[in-house]
Structures are given as structure tokens and as C-alpha cells.
């Protein structure tokens, strides 16, 4: 547990009588980027939402840097995470206001907000759009703003639920490359759900395969290719090659 930025232990989650998650152990190491893969309905997005404290598990425990996340401390830990969905979900205001919104809610000084917002807009190459309305952004621009809005909060753990899925291939390829460089520089512990095999070699240090809500294998991409534990994992690994 010492190396885990976040860990899910013996997590069970049901919808009605159907068990969606049965995760014995899932650890995201400090500074690691983990890709969650599996067929539709395998529990990837649900696991992310449980770990991001959006869904309450029926059983099990979550740990953040070794500390158990209790109901009393949930808000404290939630402030140290960020979550980005497939849709950018931007506010109908300027790019600057979107990225600044979380910092304002936490009471940061205007000078600090200005510096942090413009720094992240520059990192994503959209600083010239700071005063633009989000209504007029392209898909790629909107996703860059959405990622900047998450990262400006300086999260220790970042969750991504197919954030690039809606983009065309050239835009997606460029953004994944840029974002991968940012993750390597910041060393933010990251979990991302993907159905796109092209994202994994560029972004991930580790791949975790889910089937029917269970973690079947969690290893480096190379180990996944060389030593799949069963035919299902071999099938998923072949999709990445």
C-alpha cells in the first residue's frame, strides 16, 4: 500500500440485484498512469466513479495515500482528485472563467488565479482563447479547456472517463501526445478508461483488464502481451498491438 496513491480494496457495487463490481484489489501507484480496458459492461466507468467518490460502494474500502477514506473525510479527499468525462461539460461563459471557477470557489487570491489559469491555458496551447466564449470552441479546444480546468486544481489523482472518444482522429492524436507529455512532467497519478488501443502505448505505464466487474490482470503493456492470464486478456492485449 505504501506506493499506492489510491487503492480500492474488496469493492463490491450492485445495481439492483446485479453485481457490477467485485474488485479485490486495484492500486494506482504514485505518478503512474493506468489504462482501464475491457468490453462494454465490464465495470470500467463504474470503478472510476466509485474511486472518484461519485458512487458509494456496497462493500469494501478506498485508501488515499494509505489513509482510509471515511464518510467524515470524503470532502477532504475529494478535493485532492479531479475527474474528466467524455463530454467537456463546460460552463456557458468564457474559457478563463471555466478554468478559474474551481479556484474561486476555494477562495484563492485573484493574482494566484490569474497566474495558474494562464499557465495551464498556455500548456494546452489555448491561452489566446481566454476571453472567448465556450460556445465557439472546436471539439479539440473544448477538451483542452476541460483538461486545464481539472489540472489547474493541482489534483494528486486524476480520473479520465474516455475524454478523447468524441474527437476526430487527427485532433485526438495531437491532444493525446500533448497530454501524455504533461502527465509525465507533472507525475499526477492517473486512471483512464479507454476503448481506443492507440491511446494506451502513448499514455499508460500499466494496463488493467476488467471482465464482469473483476480485475483479471494488471501489468505493464509488455507483460500483458507476453503473459496474458487467459484468452480474454490475450484478446484485449492483441487489440493494443
Predicted regions and their residues:
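ABC ATPase "signature
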Residues: 218-219, 227
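Conserved ABC ATPase signature
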Residues: 133-137, 141
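Helix-to-loop junction immediately C-terminal to a conserved catalytic motif
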Residues: 52
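Conserved ABC ATPase "signature" region
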Residues: 104, 111-129, 181
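Conserved ABC ATPase "signature" C-loop
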Residues: 212-213
